[in-house]
Amino acid sequence: IRPSRGLGDVYKRQSLMGSGDDVDWRRIFIVLGLTGIGLAVIVKLVLKEPVRGAMELNKGTEIKKPPFKESLKELIKIPAWWAMCFGIAFGSFVSYAKSAFQTKYLVTLDPSFDFQTLVIILGIMNGTTYAAGAFFGARLADKWGKRDVRAYGWLPAISIGLALPVALITWWVPSIEVHLVFATLFLLLIGIYLGPSFAIAQTLAPIHMRAMSTALFFFILNMIALGGGPTFAGWIMDLFKESYNELESVRYAMTVTSIFFIPSVISFLLVAKVLPRDWKAAEERNLKLAK
């Protein structure tokens, strides 16, 4: 290390997530996983749970927390809720894998592209385009859903269906600039399904089980998407490295991983099919609880 470098510069260049150097993907996932466990402990100790049903119940009314088994039995009876969970889980399976290996792919695609400029562009893209997709999707779902609640299933199915070919193109373009254009469109499309999915999770769950509904929803999402997406893509990538170079192995691995958008679309189409019945039942059930 040259004496002229400050400690901040050294750390910035050599840190696990901030350098352009090749770091084993397993090591990164282990570090992030351990950090997440630590954060979960802090959240458990610091955050307080709000009153259940406070938005719907009369002032002073409180609903007791049901046992886990009772909550699970109730949620099992709501097929649209489960279809939504697997729809967003398989959709996020692809998007999390893309996020995990996008920087590695771009550095391999064009090593001469300034790395700091690249990560700034990616940060702005993820912070604006993805958020815009989520906002637009929520507004459109609410507007369309007033006429037909099946829109909460149709809209995610359409957006993910459109995201599939965009995702495939994104990994096979010849330059970083073209990749970023299609990646921006991809982020916009996959952000759209967030609003409708969370609306379904909260609306269909009984008032006194919404915390349990959210917890189980995120458990399924994280186990399949966050736990499975990057790991699956990394495993497939290692297999392709036996026959292809670094760039091609990433391209083929992400092409295979993108196929998981198909079960996501199917799941959301199933949501649209059964949602009217489940939505009506949820409104009647919650009205009784509120009284």
Where do the model's predicted regions map?
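Loop-to-transmembrane helix entry/capping segments in MFS-fold secondary transporters
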Residues: 115-117, 207-217
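Helix-to-loop junctions at the C-terminal end of transmembrane segments
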Residues: 134-149, 237-238
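Single conserved hydrophobic/aromatic residue that forms the stacking wall/gate
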Residues: 1-11
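Extracytoplasmic gate region of multi-pass secondary transporters
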Residues: 78-135, 190-194, 198, 225-233
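C-terminal transmembrane helical hairpin of 12-TM major facilitator-type secondary transporters
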Residues: 149-197
